[in-house]
Regions:
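Gram-negative outer-membrane beta-barrel transporters
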Residues: 586, 590, 730-907, 1012-1016
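Transmembrane beta-barrel wall of Gram-negative outer-membrane proteins
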Residues: 280-371, 408-436, 619
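C-terminal beta-signal and adjacent terminal beta-strands/loops
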Residues: 726, 739-740, 744-746, 834-836, ...
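Periplasmic N-terminal accessory/gating domains of Gram-negative outer-membrane beta-barrel systems
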Residues: 66, 89-106, 118-238, 275-278, ...
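Solvent-exposed loop/turn elements at secondary-structure boundaries
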Residues: 391, 395, 605, 611-615, ...
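Repeated loop/turn-to-beta-strand initiation elements of outer-membrane beta-barrel proteins
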Residues: 302-305, 354-357, 428-431, 501-504, ...
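Periplasm-facing N-terminal accessory domains of Gram-negative outer-membrane beta-barrel systems
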Residues: 28-120
């Protein structure tokens, strides 16, 4: 057997590491989602200390190695560190390493041949201490790659991710591992920033504030929860001991942007086949981004400041309505200005070497101001000739803040405040705590809207002769409620304790969420001017006849004051506790075993719980094996369960309050400013036909009793190999299976059958509202059959007649990586995957439905027929490659490649004629079934959208004569390949063929060029 030192020297030569050996044994490590660790081994423990010092802030930690030479330093802020081995007051070895968020950095030392010689080492690219899957990107790496400055573009660099449907999150809501776009968790400095109302997308920060972005695609430990998709974990920059200022300006000019494709009617046998549907080729888009930052020490080594502000302005001119819209002649052209102002302020206080406070303030404020003008397609639209004939008189528009045009399509910002504490109580005990809050305001103001002015309706036959009826409120219908908001208060506490070969980590977190959401009648209500045929008859059971008030009432004239509102103030309480043990079973095998216990409680606007899910245990087990004992070959595996909460917005539709009241008056005149009636005399009090006076629904009638949450099981097996200093490669297999889901169903038939069988009065004619339930399982309900009393109803899965939810994701990932060496870095990922089932999850990309967790998928059993197949987020093949090359100190280039097979196609039509039996409620749904022209059309069996092929490139120049200046050009979609991303899948309109069936909804963005000038100055 070789001596240890001889073996290590041989490995050093083999791997090209001239000074620092890779660990022969690996100490137990447990990572935090807001920091990283350094661990390793020294040759001689006696009389040795290991000093870890941040090169930029001076933060200093000292560790005493164990008898076997192992050491670890936990809960370190991300950044660059010097690790020094001290003996007899002198440095005998050292290494300079990077600490990444949520990861361990192995820094081990062998006996130096001359102990007084200081040696600088290089860390391994493989983290043996981690069992999760994903990728971490530093600010330096992101600056080199040609990507747009959004979190969504970082996510797409990672394997097992794809872009979600373009109708979600303004096209920036990703899918991880076949999950829905609402099933991800986003964190900034440990604080959850996911959109709490719909869970689609998240608040962001100035892109230049990102120090590191960790994208976890699976296998995450017990500390992470509330995700069955992926986790995005961002750490922000901090100030250092050197003052630094800088900024950048970038522009994507419309003159360097290629024209987007027109959209034409598909060829499906309709008279419109091949004709122009949406004219796009004269659409214009430009974007300008300005970013300024400052950072430095308030007190050297103690107190630091980093502040960053960013403004993004996007100007668009485009058609917004298609050629089949009669409204296009007035509002078919849009001029739009989107502005997003973002800011971050970070304060770091190193109280001493063992205690640290971090305060973070983030502001993300997206706004959109849209003006609508006329667009005349005219006869030219039929021939396909350029039909551009826009008007210049503004006839419509809208203003949005964190909203619109639909709730799930919006980018949603927030104002966020976070306070983090880290206490290294000893070498073996670390305590971390976090408290924070976020606030979001949603605003929607249509063009010409007059707050507080009621809408009016009348006809010539209902108007009093001689009076002038005016329209005071130009906006009709319902609007987002005034003062809509989301608030979130968060706290977490974590304790890590090392004892022997075990590092035990435990903690808890609590999220309290409150929202005001829903819609109400624009202006507050409607004045409906009416005339009774017989003025002497009462208008209703609780209303008098118009003639009883005399005057115009004797001729039957009266007005109805209508108030309609679906506004609710729902709230959610989310809590979790976890414990995890990282056990170094042998010198080469690490086992992480943990369990997470989740509790979700959703309340209606009256603070009554309508769903409460407790004791949801999620076991997690991860194993890593350092096969060669030198960190050059890692085999790993994971198995675990993951739960997901329901979004807050479910309460608005399913459990929210409903207000629909009427009150009758006679009147004598019309206000010429508002159109409201004057001279009112009551004919009735406030009435409501269905007793809708703004009270919430009985929470017991909203959802099945004792529901289980949506949860998923996952298995991951893989390996990573550091083959040489120039090559890492690996493979990974992932399997995910959805075990339970929550959706609503609206079928009265099971309740009718139960009531008839149990002799309940009125059961045969019972009309059910929608219930939340677990599809494919037995469910218990509380039902009012019309008596005002609730009846317990137990329905088996067979009686409900729904299949069990099914969603599986199986993937094989292969990667090869050239670490940053000899001036270049590159990585290639290939994924072969299959995403199959009868539900996408909480969203429904088939139609872009906006009702997260209350989709139409399980409304009726007939909707599930033929629904098992390839799901919308399935991409059978994906090849991702990115990297950069530094030609000289002044010139570098970068590239980013995506090659992906297209999304599966569906034909979703009417039920066949045989289902149109009397009383079948499913026939009311129209084109929502997996039948095409009366024939079964199983999900995902009609081919795919075209292959997506995108190449992005950049070039950067840093002139030596102006230190700190960087000039860069990025070209996105350099080949200008525009392919369909999704299509209209509804086959029928009424009983006929939908002329838009097969129509492209969105294409790949056309080629564009971004020019950037950046300047950084260090004092």
């Amino acid at each position: 057997m070789l001596k240890k030192t001889v073996l290590v020297r041989a490995l050093q030569v083999a791997l090209g590491a001239s000074a620092v050996a890779m660990a022969v044994t690996n100490p137990v490590m447990a990572q935090s989602n807001a920091s990283g660790n350094i661990y390793g081994q020294v040759e001689t423990a006696e009389g040795t200390t290991v000093v870890v010092r941040n090169t930029e802030t001076g933060l200093r930690r000292v560790a005493t190695p164990e008898a076997n030479g192992r050491y670890q330093v936990s809960a370190l802020p991300v950044g660059r560190y010097v690790v020094e081995v001290m003996r007899g007051g002198a440095v005998v070895n050292s290494a300079e390493v990077d600490v990444n968020v949520g990861q361990g950095t192995n820094t081990s030392f062998t006996a130096a041949s001359v102990q007084s010689v200081k040696v600088t080492g290089r860390r391994s690219r493989i983290d043996i201490s981690n069992t999760n899957s994903g990728a971490t990107f530093t600010a330096r790496e992101l600056a080199k790659l040609p990507i747009t400055p959004t979190v969504a573009s970082i996510i797409q660099l990672a394997p097992n991710t794809t872009r979600g449907d373009s109708r979600y999150g303004d096209g920036n809501a990703p899918s991880f591992g076949g999950s829905a776009a609402s099933e991800n968790a986003f964190y900034i400095n440990g604080f959850p920033v996911t959109n709490v109302l719909f869970q689609v997308g998240a608040s962001e920060l100035p892109f230049g504030s990102i120090a590191q972005a960790q994208v976890l695609t699976g296998g995450f430990g017990a500390e992470f929860g509330r995700s069955t998709g992926g986790v995005i974990n961002i750490q922000t920059k901090s100030g250092t001991n050197n003052w630094e200022v800088g900024g950048s300006v970038s522009t994507e000019p419309k003159s360097l942007r290629s024209a987007p494709k027109n959209i034409y009617y598909p060829n499906n046998g309709s008279v419109t086949d091949g004709k122009l549907y949406l004219y796009n080729e004269d659409n214009e888009r430009s974007q300008h981004i300005a970013n300024v930052y400052v950072g430095g020490p308030i007190i050297k080594d103690k107190l630091f400041l980093f502040a960053n502000v960013e403004r993004t302005q996007t100007d668009l001119q485009n058609t917004r309505l298609a050629s089949d819209s009669t409204a296009a002649i007035n509002t078919g052209w849009e001029e739009r200005k989107d502005t997003t102002n973002r800011a971050l302020v970070k304060m770091d206080w190193n109280i001493n070497d063992s205690h640290r406070l971090e305060g973070t303030y983030i502001k993300d404020d997206p706004k959109s101001d849209r003006s609508y003008y006329g667009f005349n397609y005219g006869a030219a639209a039929v021939s396909g000739i350029n039909p551009l004939d826009r008007g210049y008189e503004k006839k419509g528009g809208a203003y949005y803040e964190s909203y619109g045009p639909t709730p799930v399509a919006a980018r949603v910002g927030a104002e966020i405040k976070i306070l983090n504490y880290t206490g290294n109580l000893s070498d073996d005990v670390t305590l971390t705590a976090m408290i924070g809050e976020s606030n979001t305001e949603h605003v929607y103001v249509p063009f010409n809207f007059r707050p507080g002015v009621f809408q009016t309706t009348s006809s010539p036959t209902t108007r009093i002769p001689g009076l002038n009826y005016v329209t005071g409120q130009p906006v009709t219908g319902n609007l987002l409620t005034d003062g809509a908001f989301d608030k979130q208060n968060v706290m977490s506490l974590n304790l890590q304790y090392k004892v022997g070969d075990h590092t035990i980590r435990m903690g808890m977190d609590k999220n309290d969420i409150e929202s005001k959401a829903g819609t109400s009648r624009a202006g507050g209500g409607t004045w409906s001017y009416l005339r009774a045929t017989n003025p002497n008859l009462p208008l209703g059971p609780n209303a008098r006849a118009p003639a009883t008030n005399g005057g115009n009432g004797t001729a039957g004239y009266y007005v109805n004051k209508i108030i309609v509102s679906g506004v609710s103030t729902p709230s959610v309480n989310q809590q979790a506790q976890y414990i995890e043990d990282a056990w170094q079973v042998t010198k080469n095998v690490l086992v992480k075993a943990g369990v997470r216990n989740e509790q979700f409680t959703n309340f209606n606007g009256d603070a009554q719980a309508y769903v409460s899910m407790r004791h949801q245990l999620a076991p997690r087990l991860g194993v890593t094996w350092d096969v060669m004992g030198d960190n050059s070959l890692k085999a790993f595996g994971n198995i675990g369960r993951y739960h997901l909460q329901m979004p807050t917005n479910v309460a608005v539709r399913a459990a929210g309050a409903s207000l629909f009241t009427q009150q009758y008056y006679t009147y004598t005149g019309i206000d010429q400013t508002t159109g409201a009636p004057t001279g009112l005399q009551e004919l009735s009090g406030v009435t409501s036909t269905n007793n809708e006076f703004g009270q919430s629904k009985d929470p017991r009638t909203v959802a099945a009793q004792n529901m289980k949450s949506l949860y998923q099981d996952e298995l991951i097996l893989g390996f990573e190999r550091a083959y040489s200093p120039d090559l890492n490669f690996g493979a990974k297999f992932t399997y995910r299976s959805l075990k339970s889901g929550i959706d609503d169903f609206c079928d009265s038939r099971p309740f009718q059958n139960y009531g008839v069988a149990n002799n309940i009065a009125g059961a045969a004619d019972f009309a059910s509202s929608c219930f939340l339930f677990n599809p494919g399982e037995d469910n218990d309900f509380m039902v009012d059959y019309g008596s005002g009393q609730l009846t317990p109803v137990h329905l088996t899965a067979a009686e409900l007649n729904f299949p069990k939810v099914k969603r599986t994701y199986a993937a094989l990932d292969l990667f090869a990586e050239h670490p940053l060496r000899n001036g270049w870095y590159g990585k290639v990922n290939y994924t072969l995957s299959r995403n199959k089932g009868n539900t996408e999850g909480q969203t429904r990309s088939d139609s872009g439905q906006a009702d997260v967790s209350t989709t139409a998928v399980f409304d009726m059993p007939e909707l599930t027929l033929n629904s098992d197949g390839l799901l919308p987020n399935d991409r059978k093949h994906q090849l991702k490659a990115y990297g950069y090359y530094q030609f000289t100190d002044q010139i570098s280039v970068g590239g980013n490649l995506l090659v992906a097979s297209g999304r599966p196609k569906n034909c979703i039509g009417n039920l066949p004629d045989s289902y149109y039996a009397a009383g079948n409620p499913a026939t009311d749904y129209g084109s929502e079934f997996f039948f095409c022209n009366g024939v079964a059309s199983p999900r995902g069996t009609l081919g795919r959208q075209p292959w997506d092929f995108r190449i992005d490139m950049n070039a950067a120049y840093s002139p030596s004569f102006i230190k700190g200046l960087v000039i860069k050009a990025d070209v996105f979609n350099i080949l200008n390949r525009q392919v369909g991303q999704n299509m209209t899948e509804a086959y029928n309109t009424g009983s006929g063929v939908n002329p838009l069936y097969g129509n492209v909804i969105s294409y790949t963005a056309p080629r564009s060029v971004k020019l950037t000038a950046e300047y950084n100055y260090k004092f």
